Amino acid sequence: RLMESLKNHGIKAKLLVRDKQTDQISVVELKKSWWKVWQFIWERVVIWQANHFKKHNLFAVDIANTGTNITALPEFTQADVIHLHWINQGMLSLTDIRRIIQSGKPIVWTMHDMWPFTGICHYAGDCDKYATQCHNCPQLYKGSRKDIAYRTFQKKKKLFEGAQITFVACSRWLESLAKKSDLIKGQTITNIPNAINTNLFKPRDKKQAREKCHLPQDKKLLLFGSVKITDKRKGIDYLVSACKQIASSYPDFSKELGVVVFGNQAEQYASLFPFPIYPMNY
């Protein structure tokens, strides 16, 4: 989305990814190899070991101990500005990020979760240890004073010392949390909401849209979406509770309502709603 917008404004831009899912020539995939698969597996093995060989939150944390050195790639050497996004699970290691910093190129890092300014977690929940020093991580099976969250936090702190990175949050909420972290203290932290291509996403004829999506014409529809509906952080439980309150307080009105849900595992919640649910199965 950002790349296309930049290109439309006359700026040359390329997107470097671990796994390419488009045929656009401006999207460049890292070279396929079994080494990439092993990097992903090895990071999980290290986390699994640090987690006392428990699967607890095995994919909820990342330590960035494996990755690819991109600084020798032509896409990197030709670039004037490096814009990082979500770089985990074998894309870039902390060592690779250090190489990027040492290149001297201006760096912008758009944060899509909390990982850039915490030890190992993507969402800290009620934990605020990232504000000073991660340790006794609640997302580990048995955290300790110098657990893997502590050690990764220390590595990141050394990594960011002397670096000049502009951290961009996609929401004011994430910006406010980032500014609390001692990890990126002194760095530029700002907020730029996710852009929307209004040439593509724009008001259209409602009747035609419902026909195309096989949705009823005679109901008022609520829309809820998440990559994984069962992820408690996304708020599906709040929506179910609110819908039940509506059905209880306004039984006649609730007959006119329906819920459109896009995201994985939407069908699991169908029986919990007091009125029809229409899974889009994104």
State where each predicted segment sits.
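Conserved donor-binding/catalytic core segment of Leloir-type glycosyltransferases
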Residues: 215-234, 240-244
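Acceptor-binding helix/loop patch of EC 2.4 sugar-transfer enzymes
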Residues: 35, 44-56, 109-156
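Nucleotide-activated donor-binding/catalytic signature segment of Leloir-type glycosyltransferases, i.e.
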Residues: 250-282
